[in-house]
């Protein structure tokens, strides 16, 4: 059975790999010249299941208003003429309740924990190397209020069976020795010892090579135009003016997924959250991070690779704008300079931005659609690397009609009201001109 995967980021590539392992004949198509060239290229590098949390949380609307007035705020909103931007924000606000937060976080942690286990198995089976570390994640709180507010997350961690450790200042210095000189500005920390780190782009590139060895064909530099459909089936995909056909289709195009789904009548509220990163060469390994730390105040992660520090975070709701905002670089430099002033050379840092495909409830969209042969794997937000292996494995099981190892409840597109009836009311696409 032939499967056409659209997108070669970490989500599309893991989907292709697990589909090939399940015995499918897989082709991956992408407009870029290689795998992991967009959102997966320079993300924060953390595999953090326990910190899988939706942006839509109680108190966020009030915080967002305050952030709009702050120079180094973790969230910025740039008004556009795109109506989808405002619809997405309205949906996000509706998810900022305690009950919705608990439901959404449980779904995210469920998939993320499974994904971490799949990554462990993959590493054991293949020996894939990507500058990975398994030394946990430490969330730093600069105020007592932040430490107190961690209680709701701890409740979900306990419910999900995720190990954790609350740290005082001495505990912070024990797990991250380079922070010993700055613990005076911290009130405490929450550490998840089972979290991991690694270079997502390096992982994706090497997994793509392994997928090729399994028979997967990667076709780069090709423009995906639209899906051709009739009734409840996809007939093919128009790619560079030619209709390409398969038995099953997987859409893993991140923030660009809705552009192909809207003509089908599928409501996929995936919108880009623009993020930034700095990649800093390490000058003093003893004064660099040991693993990953999260700065709760600025919503920024600082991650240790072999010889580099990756500083990533921020969220701009600004449409598909990929320009580099120098103020965001200033913020990232300020944070890493505050916590690890002797760790790396900021004058040699690489500055990058990418669009993180985010749903208003934070949970990705993984699974079937109203079209019988179309499947989605998109909307992972800031957690694409964390959720990639689990999402790919889950999707491959669903396509192969195997029972997945975890519940897929609440993960597919139907939670947004997409039904078979919607698909039946969509007229077939016109013939390609």
Swiss-Prot record:
<dbReference type="InterPro" id="IPR023080">
    <property type="entry name" value="DadA"/>
</dbReference>
<comment type="similarity">
    <text>Belongs to the DadA oxidoreductase family.</text>
</comment>
<dbReference type="GO" id="GO:0005737">
    <property type="term" value="C:cytoplasm"/>
</dbReference>
<protein>
    <recommendedName>
        <fullName>D-amino acid dehydrogenase</fullName>
        <ecNumber>1.4.99.-</ecNumber>
    </recommendedName>
</protein>
<dbReference type="InterPro" id="IPR006076">
    <property type="entry name" value="FAD-dep_OxRdtase"/>
</dbReference>
<dbReference type="GO" id="GO:0008718">
    <property type="term" value="F:D-amino-acid dehydrogenase activity"/>
</dbReference>
<dbReference type="GO" id="GO:0055130">
    <property type="term" value="P:D-alanine catabolic process"/>
</dbReference>
<keyword id="KW-0285">Flavoprotein</keyword>
<dbReference type="InterPro" id="IPR036188">
    <property type="entry name" value="FAD/NAD-bd_sf"/>
</dbReference>
<dbReference type="Pfam" id="PF01266">
    <property type="entry name" value="DAO"/>
</dbReference>
<keyword id="KW-0274">FAD</keyword>
<dbReference type="GO" id="GO:0005886">
    <property type="term" value="C:plasma membrane"/>
</dbReference>
<keyword id="KW-0560">Oxidoreductase</keyword>
<feature type="binding site">
    <location>
        <begin position="3"/>
        <end position="17"/>
    </location>
    <ligand>
        <name>FAD</name>
    </ligand>
</feature>
<comment type="pathway">
    <text>Amino-acid degradation; D-alanine degradation; NH(3) and pyruvate from D-alanine: step 1/1.</text>
</comment>
<comment type="function">
    <text>Oxidative deamination of D-amino acids.</text>
</comment>
